[in-house]
Amino acid sequence: TQYSKKEEISTDSYQYLIGVSLPNVIEPWLNNFVDVFTEKVSQDKKINVIFRDAAGNPEKQIQDIETLMEYGIDILIVSPDGSDSLSSVLSEAFQKIPVILTGVGAGTEDYTCLIKSDDQKIGRLAGEYILNNLYEKNKKIVVFQGVEESPVSKQRLKGFQDSVQGTIPEEDITYYCGDWLRDRAELRMKDYLISHDSADIVFAFNDDMAYGAYQACQQYRIEGKVHLIGVDGFEGESAGLSLVDKGVLDATIQTPDFGGLSYEIARKLLEGNKVEKNIIIQPELILQGGAERKE
């Protein structure tokens, strides 16, 4: 990947050094995090950043954090993998410098700030949108979850299931794990279409998987008949907002700009300001033709 270039220290002179530890940058939201954070830092002469990608290996993420601490960083930003494996290394870091967590917690209260989305609400918004706008009796729904044990994926699933329970029969919903990846979702969608005539509605827990499902539908020439809902709502050529504008997705549920928010929180801390310990960002349903905020 191009990611290795971003692991280098990028500027010669700076006042503050930020270390960022990510569990697996292949996940689209973490890739977006890197892009946004890098862009912010490139415009800030006082700050430099070092990224470390654990590539899905929890042991490596612990080592990455220890290495970043050895570099003498001023702030540590970590996206945990959802387990408690980082709790002790984060506690050690927190004794010395501010620690910002993004996405999920890490089984410890030893952090300065946690930025997360209301993931149950994301699932609920999708379920309510499907019920109110798309679902009719006997319509078939395909749901693409993220990585099986991901807390984010579990929360989105709970929100969705709570919202449709008792209204949509279980036999009308098929669940797959797409592991957050476009290619995986495309393959699973093809598997589904081989054994079923068609699908009516797809809800994917990120826009990349929604687009993968769309590509499978294209190959079966049913793309115009299937309603697709994604999550993330990032900007970019094949990202969620663009896919909604083009009519590929019916809707996306926009999640926080983790890269931008993490940069702002880090900046405040470096300037000696206090920040909230827990920041929960409310999701927003984005439809074709504009945004519709749902409470």
Regions found by a protein language model. Give the residues of each.
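Hinge/cleft segment of the Venus flytrap/periplasmic-binding protein
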Residues: 2-9, 148, 152, 164, ...
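Extracytoplasmic "Venus flytrap"
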Residues: 17-36, 50-59, 80-83, 148-154, ...
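Short, solvent-exposed amphipathic alpha-helices that sit
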Residues: 29-43, 47, 122-126, 151-169, ...
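Short beta-strand elements in bilobed, periplasmic/extracellular small-molecule ligand-binding domains
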Residues: 37, 41-54, 140-143, 164-183, ...
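Hydrophobic alpha-helical segments within soluble ligand-binding/sensing domains
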Residues: 61, 114-141, 155, 184-186, ...
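Hydrophobic alpha-helical
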Residues: 76-93, 160, 173-174, 178-239
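Flexible loop/hinge segments that line or gate small-molecule binding clefts
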Residues: 82-121, 234-245
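Exported/periplasmic ABC-transporter solute-binding proteins
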Residues: 215-256, 263-270, 274, 279
